[in-house]
Amino acid sequence: MVLFSYIVTYNRPKLCPNAIWDADGTTVFNQSLIGYHARGIFVDSNNTLYAVAQDHSEILTLFQNSTIQVLSKRVQLANYTGIIVNIDGEIYLENGTESGRIVKWAKNTNNSMSVAHFPGHCYGLFIDHNNSLYCSMNEKDAVVKMSLNDKTSKIVNVTGTYTDGSGQNQFSGPWGIFVDNNFTLYVADSGNNRIQCFQLGENIGTTIAGNGTPNNLQLKYPTGVVLDADNNLFIADKNNSRIIRVIRDDYQCVVGCDSNSSSTSDKLNNAYALSFDSHGNLFAADEYNHRIQKFTLATNSCGNPN
């Protein structure tokens, strides 16, 4: 039973089946800004891009008017923390001083407060419509959650056995996560080279991408997953250095389609994470090229993005 309904801030653009993106990306954060490790990113409904500059202990933002701002300096950040922002502009990520401790920053402040303490590092974070905070514990092989509505809320195991494995109720290093409007959970099960789907209340998953599904799709250590408005999957296929779109019973490559890593503008070198703005433009954390790339939705595909 749904007791609360919160407005979420992530974008799920409506995309045509024949949508394509410009082959050449634009660097929005380079190495001097993002540091050596380009990992956690998030674009909110105001089209503000948030990025974790872990090496600089900073959180970066890029506003729609192209203004860059450093939100917080001298922040202790966990190496692989995800990042999520709620409707009030509060930023959630993992503090680097203590495993599993999630902190939030109120909008326009440098002050943080602890909101959760999970039993392992959170490589992926997500907030659903019920204002529940999810954590994918890569090293514990489980996904857990807790309500942000009640300070006394307990941590609940969503799925995973806390043991590395390839069963449909197991993970081998879960990474990026996404929860849709029906509270269906999608998990990038990196070590098993697949994307797993879990219906509400179920701890037995279904493989919906990877290991031959669909149409012989082979993923290699996927670490990011998001959905568009029609529940089509977009996957950061990390070690194949590409972004994949799964639509119906087939898949398409969006970026890095020859799977050869490079530093040219049309390539990625370890596609770590991705996020959309409201226009359908795609942002990718290009980890080993030490940059965040923007790939614009082509004007001859699904209308005229701004």
Question: Language-model segments: which ranges?
Answer:
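Short loop/turn segments that connect beta-strands within beta-propeller blades
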Residues: 63-67, 105-110, 147-151, 199-203, ...
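Beta-rich, blade/repeat-based domains predominating
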Residues: 34-46, 76-91, 118-133, 164-184, ...
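Beta-propeller domains
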Residues: 50-74
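A short beta-strand motif characteristic of beta-propeller blades
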Residues: 26-32, 68-74, 110-116, 156-167, ...
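Blade-level signature of beta-propeller repeat domains, shared across WD40, Kelch, NHL, RCC1
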Residues: 269-306
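Structural signal for beta-propeller blades
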Residues: 57-60, 99-103, 141-144, 193-195, ...
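Residue position within the beta-strands of beta-propeller blades
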Residues: 50-53, 92-95, 134-136, 186-188, ...
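Blade/loop signatures of beta-propeller domains
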Residues: 3-24
